């Protein structure tokens, strides 16, 4: 349904932002 789609979309964006933040932290730290 639409709610499922919006949830998955938000989850995907959040996950991408999360991993981008991790990648930035890793490059800054190592």
UniProtKB/Swiss-Prot annotation:
Keywords in alphabetical order: Antibiotic, Antimicrobial, Bacteriocin, Secreted
Subcellular compartments: Secreted
Signal peptide bounds: none
Coiled-coil region(s): none
Entry note: thermal dependence: Thermostable in a pH-dependent manner. Retains 100% activity after 15 minutes at 121 degrees Celsius at pH 4. Retained activity is lower when incubated at basic pH or pH 2.
Activity-pH dependence: Activity is stable between pH 2 and 12 at 25 degrees Celsius.
GO cellular component: extracellular region
Taxonomic superkingdom: Bacteria
Gene Ontology terms describing biological process: defense response to bacterium; killing of cells of another organism
Miscellaneous comment: Antimicrobial activity is lost upon treatment with alpha-chymotrypsin, trypsin, pepsin and actinase E, but not when treated with proteinase K or endoproteinase Glu-C.
Job description of the protein: Bacteriocin with activity against species of Lactobacillus, Lactococcus, Pediococcus, Leuconostoc and against B.subtilis and, to a lesser extent, against B.coagulans, B.cereus and species of Enterococcus, Listeria, Kocuria, Staphylococcus, Corynebacterium, Salmonella, Pseudomonas and Escherichia.
Designated name of the protein: Bacteriocin plantaricin KL-1Y
């Amino acid at each position: 349904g639409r709610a499922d789609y919006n949830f998955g979309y938000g989850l995907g964006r959040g996950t991408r932002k999360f991993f981008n933040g991790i990648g930035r932290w890793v490059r800054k730290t190592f």
